[in-house]
Amino acid sequence: MKTYIFKHSLLGVILGLSILGCTEGDKFDYNKNMAFITGTETTPVTKFVVEDTPSSYAVTASTTDKVDKDVNVKFAIDRSLVETYNNEHNTKYYAIPEGAVTLEDADAVIQAGKAFSTPATVKVISTEDFAEGRVYVVPVTMVEVDGLEILKPSKTIFLQISRVIHFTSLNISNTN
């Protein structure tokens, strides 16, 4: 009988403490509208397949809710972010060489009533200066968003260049 009372008393105390522990609530503002780069919700690194040059990749900004008025978004390529990313994540990416990439339509707009922007276009125009064996990335970041706060972990997308290599090989599977 004593163990029955002890077990139920202990269970009651644990239940009471767990309820009291949740009364503070979290400090996160669920109604706050923030901007982020589309596709960075799970990882900031995204593959960008470059088969021939020029190759294009559309980068857009999204918001956590629809906007009431037009919001201007400014994108930029910031090569210095590659070293920062490498240090934080223990990776060995290389910034794409100067002159190998351009950013078109860097000034995008999230139109009123929508939650995504017009695209900025990243265009790889040359792979001539690429060294064999290196993994290159293009760090595209949101520099400025009018009237909205930028979600820091999703501020930059790293476009990992994946090159398609064509080669011929001997087919030894034919037994004729």
Please describe what each predicted stretch is:
Residues S18-G21:
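C-terminal motif of bacterial Sec signal peptides marking the signal peptidase cleavage site
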Residues M1-L10:
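Bacterial N-terminal signal peptides that target proteins for export
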Residues S126:
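Residues on the solvent-exposed faces and adjacent turns
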Residues T23-E104, A108-Q111, A115-P119, D129-P139, ...:
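Acidic/polar, low-complexity intrinsically disordered N-terminal segments immediately downstream
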